[in-house]
């Protein structure tokens, strides 16, 4: 087998040190299991120079946020497009189906076609159970398509064979409403005991309390399970080192626990006392609100809950800058649930939600901010949403419940059991939302998706 080489398959350098694409050995068909590395971990696992060269070489071909495996897909696609390869079959985690990763599959569809796919199947990687996708593609000459072991008319770039939602566009009307939470970039978070100790510390030379810079903190687990009572040290987005040091106990905690890690990274060492990505837009949008909506990024069920300032949302959750029950109700409806399941990706067997693909493409009954004032349909959704939230709160924290009993009362456990009262509350909410859309109560999930896609197309074209 003289045509098998031990080499970097996606990046090489010429004699001057400039990045170039490596030449792959001649072949008719390529079958492979490329290495997996999440896009967010590439700089920490590889070095900055390598990643910068990779980005430069594949600029406008592979999104910078995409996982490492996508570069093998793009390289194989380009060889097929140039007539140097007939077809390829590659394996990736099932996140290839969505987000930035899906762009490489869209390029495959633009210059050729996908003729085979196993969209989501279990796999063992380094002893751990993961979910993978298998994709076979060519120049479009293969007429027979197979998807998940069955014949299909077509295989879409999200590895579905049903209604193709990949054409859905982000709607301008939904912008600046949903935000990824704060990325702390170090152990700024505090357990309840440590938080109490730091909050009670006095004697700051600026005369200010530590509540200025220590806030309640919520991530996905606080939503799906029980609130853990964690706090986080947060010096905001622009506080200087000198001003931060005036909060003596919190600053010394960060100096001891965060600084050593942050100084190892070129990108975070200069402002090691500040969070790595403090999400300025999110903070600005939530400023002055009495409450806001949160949802976990990855969860078995698509759950929404209320939170309130000064709570800081972690990057494992998303915040919505709306405080009204109507908006909460539409998000928690069947319409938004099935749309987000199709538009999102997954982590292992749990759906992953992202604002750009799941929310910003989602057409609400009326463009946000354009809800008709006093409309009975808006009030019906609001009332059903308030009722759902009220019933859930009472179930989560019943009067007189013991601590062991409370530990079992989580939203995940509630939706696992899905008692009749919860089913009835969601049925009432869905009925109100469907009425606002002008749908019948017996509309199928597939027809919901068709209606939403048509609305997305109409609004996106109208906004151009």
Model region roles, listed by residue range:
Residues 16, 144-149, 373-375:
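Short, charged, solvent-exposed linker or helix-capping segments at domain edges/interfaces
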Residues 5-6, 10-13, 26-129, 156-464:
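S-adenosyl-L-methionine
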Residues 148, 153-158:
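Conserved P-loop NTPase catalytic core
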Residues 131-144:
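Conserved beta strand-loop-helix elements of the APE1-like EEP
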């Amino acid at each position: 087998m003289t045509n098998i080489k031990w080499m970097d398959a996606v990046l090489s350098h010429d004699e001057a040190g400039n990045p170039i694409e490596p030449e792959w050995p001649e072949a008719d068909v390529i079958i492979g299991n490329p290495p997996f590395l999440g896009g967010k971990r590439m700089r920490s696992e590889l070095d900055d120079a390598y990643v910068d060269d990779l980005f430069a070489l594949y600029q406008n071909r592979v999104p910078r946020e995409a996982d490492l495996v996508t570069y093998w897909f793009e390289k194989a696609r380009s060889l097929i497009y140039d007539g140097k390869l007939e077809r390829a079959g590659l394996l990736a985690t099932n996140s290839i189906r969505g987000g930035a990763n899906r762009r490489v599959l869209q390029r495959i569809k633009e210059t050729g076609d996908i003729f085979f796919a196993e969209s989501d199947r279990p796999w063992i990687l380094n002893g751990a159970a993961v979910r993978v996708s298998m994709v076979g593609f060519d120049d479009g000459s293969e007429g027979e398509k197979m998807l998940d072991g069955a014949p299909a008319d077509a295989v879409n770039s999200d590895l579905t064979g049903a209604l193709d939602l990949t054409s859905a566009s982000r709607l301008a009307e939904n912008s600046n409403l949903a935000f990824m939470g704060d990325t702390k970039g170090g152990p700024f978070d505090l357990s309840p005991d440590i938080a109490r100790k730091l909050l009670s510390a006095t004697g700051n030379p600026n005369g200010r309390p530590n509540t200025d810079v220590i806030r309640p903190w919520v991530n996905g687990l606080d939503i799906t399970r029980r609130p853990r009572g964690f706090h986080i040290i947060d010096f905001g987005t622009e506080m200087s080192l000198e001003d931060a040091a005036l909060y003596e106990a919190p600053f010394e905690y960060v100096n001891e626990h965060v600084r050593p890690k942050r100084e190892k990274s070129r990108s975070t060492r200069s402002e090691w006392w500040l969070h790595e990505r403090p999400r300025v837009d999110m903070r600005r949008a939530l400023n002055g609100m009495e409450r806001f909506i949160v949802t976990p990024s990855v969860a078995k069920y698509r759950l929404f809950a209320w939170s309130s300032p000064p709570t800081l949302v972690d990057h494992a959750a998303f915040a919505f800058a709306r405080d009204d029950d109507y908006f909460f109700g539409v998000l928690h409806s069947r319409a938004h649930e099935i749309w987000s399941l199709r538009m999102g990706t997954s982590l292992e067997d749990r759906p992953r939600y992202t604002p750009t693909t799941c929310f910003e493409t989602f057409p609400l009954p009326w463009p946000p901010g354009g809800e008709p004032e006093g409309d009975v349909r808006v009030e019906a959704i609001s009332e059903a949403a308030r009722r759902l939230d009220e019933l859930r709160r009472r179930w989560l924290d019943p009067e007189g419940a013991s601590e062991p009993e409370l530990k079992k009362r989580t939203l995940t456990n509630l939706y696992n059991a899905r008692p009749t009262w919860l089913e009835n509350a969601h049925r009432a909410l869905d009925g109100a939302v469907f009425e606002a859309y002008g749908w019948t109560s017996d509309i199928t999930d597939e027809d919901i998706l068709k209606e939403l896609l048509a609305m997305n197309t109409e609004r996106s074209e109208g906004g151009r």
